[in-house]
Amino acid sequence: MKTYLITGCAGFIGSNFVHYMLKKYPEILLVNLDKLTYAGNLENLKDVEGDPRHVFVQGDICDKELVEGLFQKYDFDYVINFAAESHVDRSIKNPEIFVQSNVMGTVNLLQRAKEAWYDADAKTWKEGKKYLQVSTDEVYGALGADGYFMETTPLCPHSPYSSSKASADMFVMAFHDTYGMPVNITRCSNNYGPYQFPEKLIPLMINNVKHHKQLPIYGDGMQIRDWLYVEDHCKAIDMVANGGKIGEVYNVGGHNERPNIFIVKTIINQLHDRLQDEGISEDLIKHVADRLGHDRRYGIDPTKIKNDLGWYPETPFEKGIVLTIDWYLNHEEWMDHVTSGDYQNYYQDMYKNK
């Protein structure tokens, strides 16, 4: 039976990955580590409570003793690192937190994995071990009107968030190049789907539209992102963990490029028709000052993972956005819970005064 350390398991992509893996593999043990910051919510894992294949540990990936103890107790076969501060706006206001979690936390995981997996006397790595870093296409910077990011595209991050993720990626490859650690990195485009914290575009807009709140759009709204349904991403991570060539980077994209303003108008139209609510219209859109250093376009070329592992995105945007809206409409209690308290202060600070 394979044993995984899943960090950031209570966040958006991490919790979806936990659900995906438990559904797919009857014989598996997932030790799920999460600090439970604002975006980490145990309600995301409510459906797997009591499953003996799922062990939850609250803690920080920067905690050396905690992580070392987990390696000693469980002898992990895989580490899948989702744990990260991930919102660009928050990184602009407080970059130090992003360095601590995204860079120092990654280095701690790498060091503890090296201590557990490397036999210094024999100068060999234990068989069947792998560290997988879940990263982002934002480490590449921005694109023009055409072209795509490839795995060979130089890293050129523009925000404190993407800089911290690029730094973490470089440490992962340094541990491979220096020590021979078995690693992979996946770099994905913009994810969407269930359990996403409503600071991100799609759940933010769904929630605001439902409550007739203004819809804050940065600049002209023509920033283009490649949208990837989260379950497709989970499938890709599983395939890279179990079949990816050691030391390789794999780009994971959805072939669903859309401008932000298109996304917002799609959500407006969907909810207007479903809820039969005349208060839902494009009049709710409010253009606000653009984000500092806002990248204009991202686009992923996933040819490598398609050719090497046979992965492809199964969910077109037109289907994925319907599934996503359905989920949020059917989980109003979840949304009410995560948007209480500190979220209101954050929202006021981010959008109301612009």
Task: Describe the residue ranges of each PLM region.
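N-terminal Rossmann-like NAD(P)+-binding domain of SDR-like oxidoreductases, especially those catalyzing
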Residues: 1-191, 231, 241, 323, ...
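Secondary-structure boundary/capping motif
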Residues: 90, 141, 193-197, 225, ...
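Residue-level marker of alpha-helix boundaries and capping positions
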Residues: 8, 162-163, 196, 227, ...
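Residue-level signature of the cytosolic catalytic core of signaling kinases
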Residues: 41, 50, 145, 194-198, ...
